């Protein structure tokens, strides 16, 4: 078993423990665990559709086609209530990663980067050299909004407020919100350190969405 598998399973166990221990008395440990797992499944469903399917396969690689309204609405939903991922920056970094995998120009990691450096790069990646995300869909207002710095900050409050509105306990909500965010970071690191798939991506790729 590789270390990123260990990290992933450890984060899932941590989320389960947090869900049970921080649950308010009306829920109890069992109820808290159930709510925590349901919240994790919601994040997994929405973010799993948004990041690997829409951003990765749909826009970055043009391997899947989606209606543009579906892309934009899912982008706003995920970034507002679930996990924030800047769509334009992510596509740009991902195309750099495939064009310069594990060498100079790859914003995710270099061949010599170890465990801790790669983990650090999940939050603070190397600077991209080019603008490889010039797709027309990024000029639409929902994608411009989701790619803005102000929205990135506001989304941290809206995603927490969403959890608090469900459980009505700020400590429990904060525990769920933080543990799921940690799991998402761990999953991003696993994707970054895993084997590279696919080929290089040219700069002027158009999105595979349809009107």
How would you describe each model-predicted region?
Residues 174-175, 192, 206:
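Short low-polarity hydrophobic stretches
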Residues 1-186:
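Non-catalytic, topology-defining segments of multipass membrane proteins
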Residues 82, 138-142, 200-211:
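Active-site-proximal inter-transmembrane loops
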Residues 179-191, 195, 200-202, 211:
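Low-complexity basic/metal-binding stretches
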